[in-house]
Amino acid sequence: MSKVVLVNPANAAVGYSVITPRWLFVIAGATPTEFAGDPIIVDEPVVAFNPQDVGPGDIVGVGIHTGNCRPGYRVVREAKKRGATVIVGGVHATVFPEEPLEMGADAVVKGNADIIWKEILEDAHLGRLKKVYDGGRVPGELMAKARWDLLDSNKYLMGCIQTVAGCPENCSFCSVWVTDGRTPRLHLNEQIIAEANELHAMGFRYVFFSDDNFTPATHARIARETNAATRANLERVREDRLKLFDEYDRLGPPTLYGFTQMTAECNSDDEYMDAMYSKMRLRGALIGVESFTEEGLRNVNKTWNPVGQKMAEAIQKIQSHGIMVLASIIGGLESDTLSTLKTMRQFANISGTAFAQFPLYSVYPGTKDYHEMIRDWKNRDQANYVPKHAVQIVREKYWLDYDHTDVAVKHPSIASDDLMKEAQESWSNFYSIKEILARTRSGPMSSLPLAAKIFYAVACRVFASLYPGGIAADNVRKTRLGIIPRLSMRAAMRVARRDYDWGIRPQRREVIEEIIDMAA
């Protein structure tokens, strides 16, 4: 009997992973069992793909993004040598469908495969496989439910649930709004709750809500929308989100705590933040700070973001509602100088954010920046051509030989070595023992009991060692973890299975005002 094997490619297998790769189990859920039984799941951050396990008649599905396309193409080659039919999907394949075909894939899936996957399998079985399939953007009510029964829960720190797809923003460095659209698509409440209960029953006590923007329709976002129809839709989305929070509170697991990604604008919506903490049990969120300067925010088309002191106040307000912030601050934007990078490092410390990351600016396929920089690169030798960007892309299709420890773009005034040095110093400073202890003595972490403070300190050190370039999918990691990160990860997995809320607690208003004054 033919097999369906789904592979999440990576450079290094380390035996376990932080977050479950949702796409694997969603496509497993979209795979009809009558075709080939249960699909076989291969998550390469946990275990490497073995080509000997596939042969003629088998179908291998490979999901790639830009960061893991090279190991993905390695899986394509290995599976093809064994006579298997290989189908490639994912964000990178959506943007560049011709590239996987050039690398040997039999077919490519653009967009979401939740609905179209069954048709693709039937075509492959009948020998009529097309080169390109377009799954489009699947409506929220038709999104496939993940097959968590195929998951080895002992290999992961957190489960993964998607509640909304798409993002109404159009940041120039981000491809989400290009590939997933700017109209939020809401997953069915009953499926979200069912998956949460299933993951909790499997032993998980922490879950990652894998939404690119968990808060697409806050008061502030709605207020700045100029299109009447879009504004009305966002108002409906906000009400629907609050209904989800209510239903999740009543029917979801009471000891499953969440992390997600959202915008700083959620600080404008107290009702939303209170519900996220108390009803969704949200305990942490990545916030795209991007830059503490107005010019830096203009560089990334995110001028609606709070800036400077207002961003510090937004972070403090979010944390006052019990949601720890992971502030993501990009280094190497067009307007950056060595001086602004040093200021960025200082501001991260005084902002009071629980966690911070300092990724270097990179230009990803599908983004507005990428298309503009490629145009600049192709016209660089033409007389009288005025480039759109002072930052220059190093070469076309850099990801095929680009090492993610290097810089993919050339900054107009800062050498690549200096950029990497400043980024490393930012990481080292923020996650130094001195600064970690300082955060446990003042601000929201000071309210934690001693055991939770110790857990927070260990979490800081583990995070810095696991994600030295910023939080990303585990399949982007280039090498195996060292012994200390491995031991720390194992300890964290044991602790994270306990019915204990390690998060910060909502704080009194006078405490928040005192913290904001300190930041000022």
Per-range role (PLM):
Residues 58, 103-107, 126-128, 225-227, ...:
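Short, hinge-like loop/turn segments at secondary-structure boundaries
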Residues 6, 62, 209-211, 287, ...:
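Conserved beta-strand positions
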Residues 14, 97-99, 169, 206, ...:
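Flexible glycine/acidic-rich beta-alpha junction loops that bind and position SAM and/or redox cofactors
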Residues 144-326, 331-333, 337-346:
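Radical SAM [4Fe-4S] cluster-binding motif and immediate context
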